[in-house]
């Protein structure tokens, strides 16, 4: 499951708020090279871990925008809003579309995909089976569909397809899990679902809990994660100034595959390309010695022609 960046402790955070180190922070800073006076767009600002570091370099708060669809995250960024940063409480595609319509362009753009550590660590958000909570998994509580809705309404075939496609689960295991879910419905809790999956397929030789892939699939479906990435990518060149840099941190192969394909298309487009891709291979999260939770992360970046 993907783990996003999080900041050094801010006076705006409650003492009970989980504190985390931003993923690949030094690498993103070195590749995207923010300098004083540049404008910054963070499409997944979270609790401001990357944003604060980038804004410290640019010192251009008035022309910078931070986006997140999680209300809790937006609330913790109030100190940056007081300095002039624009906060947008929307998903990154809706925000990007609005900014394109406004004719806004930026020198540096960052998107750090996936679920954040505070989301995982709050039982009531329902992202993790480490805590017993409702099967929610919504990054934006304003949306209607929850993981419980999917678990308790999808057919065996639809659940099998979902777990196979988005969870990258073996087809046979996915079908057994789907059949067990339908038979056991209604299912409302995270540990209830995780225990059911473990009882159904066992742990075997797997490094991770046998429910990990199913939980990933449900989260992706609830939040339309891959569809939003596909919609975002072609908007990025329209949001960059000439010479502007965009970086994207992904956490699993489904995300990285979409980004790699788009960047490869740009690299092969010749004079029609809108972006230059300096490095074909992504930077791996294993290079981030400061944050062991980032080991599954990959970072790709491009420059506007």
PLM region spans:
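S-adenosyl-L-methionine-dependent methyltransferase catalytic core, i.e., the SAM/SAH-binding region
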Residues: 1-305
């Amino acid at each position: 499951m993907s783990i996003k960046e999080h900041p050094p402790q801010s006076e705006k955070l409650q003492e009970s708020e989980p504190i985390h180190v931003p993923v690949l922070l030094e690498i993103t800073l070195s590749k995207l090279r923010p300098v004083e006076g540049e404008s910054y767009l963070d499409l997944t600002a979270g609790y401001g871990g990357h944003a604060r570091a980038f804004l410290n370099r640019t010192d251009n708060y008035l022309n910078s925008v931070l986006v997140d669809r999680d209300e809790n995250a937006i609330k913790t960024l109030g100190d940056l809003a007081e300095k002039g940063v624009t906060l947008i409480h929307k998903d990154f595609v809706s925000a990007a579309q609005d900014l394109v319509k406004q004719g806004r362009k930026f020198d540096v753009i960052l998107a750090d995909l996936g679920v954040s550590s505070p989301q995982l660590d709050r039982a009531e958000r329902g992202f993790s089976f480490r805590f017993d909570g409702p099967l929610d998994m919504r990054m934006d509580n304003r949306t209607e569909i929850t993981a419980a809705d999917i678990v308790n309404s999808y057919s065996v075939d639809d659940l099998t397809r979902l777990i196979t496609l988005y969870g990258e689960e073996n087809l046979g295991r996915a079908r057994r899990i789907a059949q067990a879910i339908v038979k056991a419905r209604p299912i409302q809790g995270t540990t209830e679902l995780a225990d059911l999956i473990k009882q159904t397929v066992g742990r075997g030789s797997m490094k991770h809990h046998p429910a990990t892939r199913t939980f990933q699939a449900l989260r992706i479906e609830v939040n339309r994660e891959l569809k939003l990435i596909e919609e975002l990518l072609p908007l990025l060149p329209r949001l960059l100034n000439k010479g502007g840099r965009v970086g994207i941190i992904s956490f699993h192969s489904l995300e990285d595959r979409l980004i790699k394909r788009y960047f490869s298309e740009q690299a092969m487009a010749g004079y029609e390309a809108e972006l230059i891709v300096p490095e074909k291979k992504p930077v791996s999260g294993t290079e981030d010695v400061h944050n062991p939770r980032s080991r599954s992360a990959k970072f790709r970046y491009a420059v506007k022609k």
